[in-house]
Amino acid sequence: METVPARSSKDAPIENVDRNIVSEEMKLICRQVGISRIYSHQEEAIRRARTGESVVVSTPTASGKSLCYIIPILEKIMSEPNARALLMYPLKALANNQAESFQKFIEAAKRVVAARQNGFTDNVNLGKISRLANCQIKVCDGDSDAREKAEIRAGNTNRIIITNPDSLHWMLPQHASWGKKFFGNLSLIVLDEAHIFHGIMGSNVALLFRRLIRVCNNYGNPTPEFICTSATIRNPSEHVKALTTRNTSSVAESGAPSGDKRFMLWQPAELKLSSKGGGEVSTDDPVAEMKTRKSPNHEAAVFIADLAKNGIRCLCFVESRAQCESVKREVRTILNKDNCLHLSNKIESYRGGYSRAERRELERRLQSNQICALVCTSALEMGIDVGSLDATVHVGVPETSSSLLQQAGRAGRRHGTSLAVVIARENPIDAYYCDKYEELFKRPPEEAFIDPQNEALLTLHLPCAAKELCFDLDSLEFDREMFDLDEDDVAKRKKKYKKLNVEEIFAAKEKVEENLTPFNAALKKLTHKTEITPIAPLMFDNPTNTLRFDKRCEVNPHSAVLLRGNPFGDGWWLVLKPKEGYNGINYEQLLQTPETQAMLEKRKLLVECIDSDRALMRLYVGAIHTTREGTYEVKKIDAMKRIAFCEEYAWNGLATMPKVNENITILDTSVVENCAVRYNRNVLNTRVSLGNVRVEEFVQGYNRFRVTSAEGGKSVSQVEFETPLVCANYRTKSLFFSLPEDVLNKIPSENVFAAILGVRNVCVELASSIAFCSRKDVSSAMKFSNDPPNSKCVIFIYDCCPNGVGLSDKLFECAELLLEKAAYLVKNCPCERGCPLCICSGRGGGRAAGAKKIVKMMLDCMTTV
């Protein structure tokens, strides 16, 4: 048990705040909405924003961060007749929640205006308040249809627009329809939950913001300022500057109160399994053999049921959608058995894949205290209003300290004691923290890494920028400010870069030039034809001396940009196909169209829309799929149409888990035949290569396992497919270490696998800090073979995105740094046998536990010349 002590409030009456920070008009409106006091961090953030600074507020969950941008925006609206604001949220639920918050202030302004017109007077400027009363706030995102979007663009009083990065990406090519009215008067841009925009997604969003600023500059508005909110990370100011280009001041010390928070780390009890004859279980099933403790899902369900019976409202965080539905079902089962039917229907689930109407209804019930426990994925980790909660339950140790604090912060949002129960799963990392629980709460905040100068991403975004506004070659300096390296970037990369002038960019591309800045290299690549791209995306227009997007290109450049890094095409549909057929629907001819979707939803036949990213890991034939409405078994899949057909399934406490395998193949034979030094070199005492690989992930079959009762997780049966189902097959870039025999011979044969696994784990863990990406942007594999020559093993670290986005290139360039950092980290980690902070991190990391000395020996061999 760990206790985070209560924190007292640092606040002041809003009346006492300097009028240059909060105007008299704003104070009056705040009183109308029930705000009489303001926290110290809110006052500081508002002060900085109102003096023209860009600000990032990184105080804890439930500290009132939204007021830090609501008040500056409303002050702008009141004081500047044409001012506009743009707010971006990562989740639709957050957007709608905040629209309601803004609307409360607008309604209060209307009441003030009405009261003053009826003879009441105050020492305020009624004209300013009238501007706010007439202000419209609009949500423009994927849920808005074409008619709604056209009305939003046309409205003169639509001064606050709420959207998300995905929708903004498609707003920019239509900037002329928004015009100077919006982009020319855009004063403040808000980015909520900035910490989640890291890695490839964050780098994409950073380039999106540069395109946004470029459009604003076109309308005479080069300096819109940013207000960002973030969870606790190690580098909030640096991260937001990299995202927005703006020098940013950080407000991190919270003035909001919080009650005691008790963290409890719970390790499920060991199971005493026995056969029906009374003896010990003996099984050839490795999954069953590994399950020696009670199911964490079952333990979570017991905790939630007990909390509900004691009137304690809670959230339960789980990893997957299937787990979400399973835990909810088990909680209801427990409550029904205990004759608590009045509580059973107040247990709900919340996850991705629900319809807009379902999400809104759940949010409404949650905020009005009609739900006593909600089982959810990370979709609720971020700050929509969840009402008054007393506890959180976490199935598994959250991956980062920020996630744990964000999730636990959803309960006990102001006063009183709250509880966070972390239930350990049966894996080495969770077991490690059960042995050394104090380390769980001492984990340092993580850094957020992005790279807006990633050359591969620039080659995607620069054509978008050129289509939005051509590059004026007579005045390219502003574009260089947006997209090129600045002095700090060059110093950080410790490399001499060459910047090209306009003539050099268009010079004949006779050879690959070394040390070009990423912006110059991307421009040079985009203005020259190749065998793959016979029409260069960017063309020179001599009469205007501009660089334009070539409309002859078949691909719309905006379609080529995948902001969230999901490269696997459109999503899948799971469609209910009753055994007897249904009202004449021809299932064989179903196509994914809006009309078909509306028809299926009306008849309640569209079970779920599923994201495309490895959807077949969930939609193989035989898969059991649970939703809020029921349980279904997948009977058929149509890969061409991306539709899976299912039937209703009489749930019997079983679920399915795919048996996934992976294969990685080197495609560049020249790499392993010692071709150019650029792609194959000796680094310290290790052979390091860079090349193209093919990654295949496939489902070989599945396990049926029991999810109810304390023995949840026990395998019941296994199914093998005659032909494995390919769920991902793509070409990408990879860095690989060839470990020669003389290195492996120094390691005892029984320890070789654990040693190589430990080396892989620590290198992948460090890759994000070197390639400025997220842990999820790179993956790894090991392959034992005789290829490349003289090597028994190859460690691969590859880009998870098809065709790669330059991460492996960066790692190859910095291979010495990567290996030296790995050796230093293992040597200086205070653990004795290996821990999640060194060799036991990541997928399968626990199998390296106990091998620290061997890993250290191997890294010493690899780095000693």
Regions found by a protein language model. Give the residues of each.
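Donor-sugar nucleotide-binding helix/loop cap in glycosyltransferases
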Residues: 497
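Short cysteine clusters
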Residues: 829-838
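ATPase nucleotide-binding modules
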Residues: 476-479, 503
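Helicase motor core with emphasis on the C-terminal RecA-like subdomain
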Residues: 1-33, 37-40, 44, 50-66, ...
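Cys/His-rich metal-chelating microdomains
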Residues: 841
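Short, non-ligating residues that shape and space the ligands of small metal-coordination modules
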Residues: 844
